[in-house]
Design a protein with these regions (language model features):
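Long helical/loop segments within the catalytic core of UDP-sugar-dependent glycosyltransferases
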Residues: 6, 79-107, 130-196, 200, ...
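Cell-envelope/extracellular polymer assembly enzymes that use nucleotide-activated donors
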Residues: 22-25, 55
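Donor nucleotide-sugar binding loop of glycosyltransferases
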Residues: 33-36, 63, 124
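Short, acidic, metal-binding catalytic loop of nucleotide-sugar glycosyltransferases
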Residues: 42-53
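A conserved acidic beta->alpha catalytic loop
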Residues: 60-70, 87-88
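Acidic donor-binding/catalytic loop of UDP-sugar-dependent glycosyltransferases
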Residues: 66, 117-134
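Catalytic donor/gating beta->alpha subdomain of glycosyltransferases that bind UDP-sugars
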Residues: 135-166, 191-194, 199-261, 359
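Membrane-embedded multi-pass helical conduit in multi-pass membrane proteins
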Residues: 262-349
Length: 360
């Protein structure tokens, strides 16, 4: 699989944007992000983008850990930074969509592009300039960038590479029929955002990023996902206690609905384990019992197994994690499949819980 074909890379722009660059407002929705928000905001304030054409708006969604105080302190030092506190969350809308929608209603009047960025993102100085230049040049209405993932814990390193491979394969299999975006970075033309009703139109969606991209595409707007590996990084989770609920809350939407998610899960498990089990069974049949069919099948089985391991070795190198994690990929897909089952269960029979809130 050619990663650049599935997720084309956005290379850093070498051009210099002038004071005639489009006005961009970056909206950062936050809820209990005291450990992340300062580093995120500082990286945004260091952008190589004309100061008069850039604003940063942090929307605090009823944080209880001092997040708003940190942002307020930074805002006193930087005129481009503003803090907006949300009122109590109304029924029928998720906290993130509520924060994003209120933020979009509070941007400067001359804002041409809205850029929604998660608090766990760290931005290279060239991020906004490169993204805006690409969006303008290619006449995009939504440009989403997948960040370079900072994987530190065992759970992150085991599961996230397998999950991203699965997402890439499902995107390739759909042949562009469905839309895929990466929630940590969404650059949206303001005119297009307002034309479809923005986050208010997808307020009840758990995976609001995917829902918004779909509605934009349905209305004829141009949506594109790129790899932003050289322009932004993110550590979305910190271990099992955040990986499981964080992924389970939106896997159903990300994989195209309950039926599609279940099919993906039930295909992934046998395929992953087949890389080890089939060569082992063929070797046993050939060497122990002398079965000619098993001996004939052993070489292609070993070749297929080597290809699967090689793919995940390349993935481990890409994610900058120890290569031995590549040998554990059947465990990663199995854990991911269990998360899919949990995601479907939550969606059909229970409530999705995230950051102290429950959504029907």
């Amino acid at each position: 699989m050619d990663q650049r074909r599935v997720f084309p890379w956005l290379e850093p722009s070498s051009g210099v944007l002038t004071q005639r660059a489009p006005h961009v407002t970056v909206i950062v929705p936050v809820r209990d992000e005291s450990s992340n928000v300062a580093a995120c905001v500082r990286s945004l304030l260091r952008q190589r983008y004309p100061n008069s054409r850039l604003a940063v708006l942090v929307v605090d969604d009823e944080s209880t850990d001092g997040t708003a105080l940190i942002v307020q302190s930074l805002a006193e030092e930087h005129a481009a930074l503003k803090l907006l506190r949300t009122p109590p969350l109304p029924r029928g809308i998720t906290g993130k969509s509520h924060a994003c929608w209120l933020g979009a209603q509070s941007v400067p009047a001359d804002t041409e592009w809205l850029c929604f960025i998660d608090a766990d993102v760290r931005a290279d100085q060239r991020l906004l300039g490169s993204a805006v230049q690409a969006a303008v040049d290619e006449r995009l209405d939504l440009l989403s960038l997948a960040p370079r993932h900072d994987l530190r814990s065992f759970a992150e390193r085991l599961i996230l590479p397998c999950g991203l491979f699965t997402l890439a394969f499902t995107r390739q299999a759909s042949d562009g029929g469905d839309v895929t975006v990466s929630g940590p970075f969404l650059l949206i033309r303001r005119r297009a955002y307002e034309a479809v009703g923005g986050h208010a139109a997808v307020g009840s969606a758990i995976a609001e990023d995917v829902a918004l991209a779909r509605i934009l595409k349905q209305h004829g707007f141009k949506v594109e996902l790129r790899s932003g590996d050289r322009l932004l990084s993110a550590r979305m989770y910190t271990g099992w206690t955040t990986v499981w609920p964080g992924l389970a809350k939106n896997l159903v939407d990300t994989l195209g609905g309950p039926a599609s998610a279940l099919i993906t899960a039930f295909i992934a498990i046998p395929l992953a384990w087949a890389a080890y089990s089939i060569p082992a069974l063929d070797a046993l049949g050939c060497l122990d019992r002398g079965e000619s069919t098993a001996c004939f099948a052993l070489a292609p089985a070993l070749a297929a197994s080597a290809a699967a391991i090689g793919l995940h070795l390349a993935g481990a190198a890409h994610f900058r994690i120890p290569l031995w994690y590549a040998l554990l990929f059947p465990l990663g897909y199995s854990a991911g499949a269990l998360m899919v089952l949990d995601s479907v269960r939550r969606r059909l029979y229970g409530r999705v819980r995230w950051k102290g809130r429950a959504y029907p």
